[in-house]
Amino acid sequence: MKKIDKKEKAIVIIGSGAGGGTMAYELTKAGIPCVCLEAGPYLKPEDYTNDEWGAFGQMAWLDKRTTSGTWRVSKDFPGLPTWLVKAVGGTTTHWAGATPRFLEYEFKTKSTYGNVKDASLMDWPISLDDMKPYYTKAENAIGSTHRGGRAPLPANNNYKVFANGAKNVGYKFYATGPYGTNAEPYDGRPGSIQDGFNFQGDKNGSKWSTAKREIPRALETGLLDLRTNAHVVKITHDKNGNVDGVLYMDDANNLQRQEARVVVVSGNSIESPRLLLLSESNMYPDGLANSSGQVGRNYMRHMTCLLYTSPSPRDP
């Protein structure tokens, strides 16, 4: 693995997940050296555990948090904001693998829904047609099923029940995907054995993650300096306001500084804005890259809908 001097003004990538891991691979593939600072360890397939809570303790950000709000489902984890991974590969090592494209109307939410009370809807300045070539490129890298001629995942019994219900009420389009888990061998990864445990760390290696694809390939170029257990605390800038370095705590809890000419912030939806806000200064009192005042505001990371049924009436 390449070692880049801390005094060298390098391209520094913060985070090794979907954004950071992909950036590291694309840069090194093009012959450009870079440093990637990852807050967690480099877990290998044999390290993963087939237990959801065990995996949480192994992979998630367990740092103490301050949260606000009045309604929480979880009572035993009052400071838990969300399931984000602190390890090489980031949250690509813990995801269901669903890779749907936006629909056309989702790029135009304000035009579609109008002014919604207490919401901040906006139309994207791009369209589905603008994104199609990039969707295709990402799907080919991930190996999304149902795309590019790739086979769908086999239907399990749960899917068959829902598919039959959808058919009976008149739906015509339903499918097992697209997903980033191989139904057949693809791009050096095997087909899924559907063991039920590839959501939180995939021992079989059939699911795409940057820990499985992009980071190893970037390391193979000899141009990536991957520093694990490197927790970034601040991005610094010079007297002209240009970013010039990154401060981070190493695995021995020592404060280190990497000089930088470019910094890529890719720490997922919570850590990225948090870091930008923590990097405030006299020149940037509201944090870096925050001229709009919107960093950390009006953003929803993830929405999950769950439907439960019971064969017999139950008390409320």
Name each model feature, range by range.
Residues 29, 33, 40-51, 235, ...:
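Glycine-rich loop(s) and the adjacent beta-strand/alpha-helix scaffold that form part
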Residues 75-80, 85, 147-150, 170-180, ...:
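A short alpha-helix-loop-beta-strand transition element characteristic
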Residues 228-242:
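A conserved short coil-to-beta-strand element within the FAD-binding core of flavoproteins
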Residues 11-35:
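N-terminal Rossmann-like FAD-binding beta1-loop-alpha1 element of flavoenzymes
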Residues 1-7:
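A short, basic/flexible loop-to-alpha-helix module at the beginning of a structural domain
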Residues 311-316:
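A short, hydrophobic C-terminal helix/tail in secreted or cell-surface proteins
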Residues 106, 111-232:
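Conserved redox-cofactor binding core of oxidoreductases
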Residues 55-151:
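Redox-cofactor-proximal catalytic regions of oxidoreductases
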